[in-house]
């Protein structure tokens, strides 16, 4: 069920860490993303919810520079005329993709340190404090720090992917479906960690099909459908909106509610 497309005021933040304006992506004659605009404020968690095929991953890929796009992307106060992956990473944009890109033949600790090295280009000693911070967030990773990443469970690999992104101390962390395919216990743990990051002032753009869990942790939310922003507003307000309840929080999402705890 689609949500009615309504024009609503933008996310009002004085100095957004990310501002996307009229972003569009086309595959041939098919427009996968159409004039999408959003903002993420400093220390804010913003979520984008929507069904499969809505264009959520396309949106993140275009912001990151993985896909060619039309529109405007301003990150950390600077306009990126043509976003490029290497430039965005160097400037502090972190992405945890839906398909976790880990090095199975490397230890958990070395995978984490690689995340810091990709941005800061320095040695292990320079990142010891950051490594301890990540281990505090993810005790499981500390317990398994000397194991090969290939031996981890799916949930542990997701924790490692998030931890590796945090090692780079990103100015904005983008999470693409972090709970996808995870067991209920691990899903609750992932969202607990997201809530903790919010308390620590980490800016996050969260793309998530589990609308109920996403709206619980977010400050502001966008509903993306068929490549367009259909609705937006404070997350608590959208969670109470009858149209969102019917489309995303009704009986069809009871399973998601169980996963979110």
Model regions and ranges:
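Glycine-rich phosphate-binding loops of nucleotide-dependent enzymes
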Residues: 2-261
């Amino acid at each position: 069920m689609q949500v009615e497309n309504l024009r609503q005021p933008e996310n009002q933040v004085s100095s957004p860490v990310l501002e996307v304006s009229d972003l569009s992506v086309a595959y041939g004659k098919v427009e996968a993303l159409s004039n999408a605009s959003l903002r993420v404020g400093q220390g804010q968690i913003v979520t984008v919810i929507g069904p499969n095929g809505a264009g959520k991953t396309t949106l993140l890929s275009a912001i990151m520079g993985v896909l060619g796009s039309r529109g405007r992307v301003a990150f950390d106060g600077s306009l990126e005329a043509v976003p490029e992956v290497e430039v965005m990473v160097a400037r502090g944009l972190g992405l945890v993709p839906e398909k976790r890109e880990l090095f199975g033949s490397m230890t958990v600790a070395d995978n984490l340190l690689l995340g810091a090295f990709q941005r800061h280009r320095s040695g292990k000693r320079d990142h010891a404090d950051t490594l301890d911070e990540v281990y505090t967030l993810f005790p499981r990773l500390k317990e398994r720090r000397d194991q090969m990443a290939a031996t981890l469970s799916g949930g542990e690999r997701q924790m490692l992917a998030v931890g590796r992104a945090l090692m780079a101390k990103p100015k904005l962390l983008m999470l693409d479906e972090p709970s996808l395919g995870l067991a209920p216990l691990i899903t609750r743990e992932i969202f607990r960690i997201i809530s903790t990051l919010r308390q620590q002032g980490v800016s996050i753009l969260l793309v998530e099909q589990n609308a109920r869990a996403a709206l619980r942790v977010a400050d502001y939310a966008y509903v993306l459908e068929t490549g367009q922003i259909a609705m937006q507003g404070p997350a608590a307000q959208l969670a109470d909106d009858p149209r969102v309840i019917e489309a995303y929080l009704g009986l069809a999402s009871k399973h998601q509610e169980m996963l979110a705890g």
